[in-house]
């Protein structure tokens, strides 16, 4: 039985390791263009449609203009310790973000972008 599960486990771990490398907050030695491309992809493929739209639209309009430190902060924001729904709730004023998030200049840019795109309710 263990010989049968060995290859399956190895394949699963390999897929997990690949997925983890695609979503971690920093990739050592990553070129700036590659970082922008990765962040654009990760902004559009969040796992929940709401964040796909909010972060994907922000990324399309802003990543090319962002400096390396801003890209690093954006990477940490979207791929860091915050759950997807929490990030959505912070951006949609449903929850107050933690102090470190609220003070982050990149979060403030994303928040401003989201607030400006918000459709007024009647």
Swiss-Prot record:
Keywords: Chaperone, Mitochondrion. Gene3D superfamilies: Flavinator of succinate dehydrogenase. InterPro entries: SDH, SDH_sf, SDHAF2. GO terms for cellular component: mitochondrial matrix; mitochondrion. The keyword Methyltransferase does not apply. Pfam families: Sdh5. It comes from the Eukaryota. The keyword Chaperone applies. Belongs to the SDHAF2 family. This protein may be expected to contain an N-terminal transit peptide but none has been predicted. Interacts with the flavoprotein subunit within the SDH catalytic dimer. Plays an essential role in the assembly of succinate dehydrogenase (SDH), an enzyme complex (also referred to as respiratory complex II) that is a component of both the tricarboxylic acid (TCA) cycle and the mitochondrial electron transport chain, and which couples the oxidation of succinate to fumarate with the reduction of ubiquinone (coenzyme Q) to ubiquinol. Required for flavinylation (covalent attachment of FAD) of the flavoprotein subunit of the SDH catalytic dimer. This is Succinate dehydrogenase assembly factor 2, mitochondrial.
């Amino acid at each position: 039985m263990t010989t049968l599960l060995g290859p399956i486990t190895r394949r699963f771990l390999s897929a997990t390791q690949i997925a983890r490398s695609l979503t971690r907050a920093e990739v050592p030695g990553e070129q700036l263009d590659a970082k922008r491309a990765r962040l654009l992809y990760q902004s559009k493929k969040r796992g929940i449609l709401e964040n796909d739209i909010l972060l994907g639209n922000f990324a399309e309009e802003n990543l090319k203009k962002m400096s390396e430190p801003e890209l690093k902060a954006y990477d940490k924001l979207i791929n860091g310790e915050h759950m997807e729904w929490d990030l959505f709730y912070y951006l949609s004023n449903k929850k107050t973000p933690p102090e470190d998030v609220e003070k982050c200049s990149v979060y403030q840019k994303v928040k401003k972008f989201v607030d400006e795109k918000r459709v007024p309710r009647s």
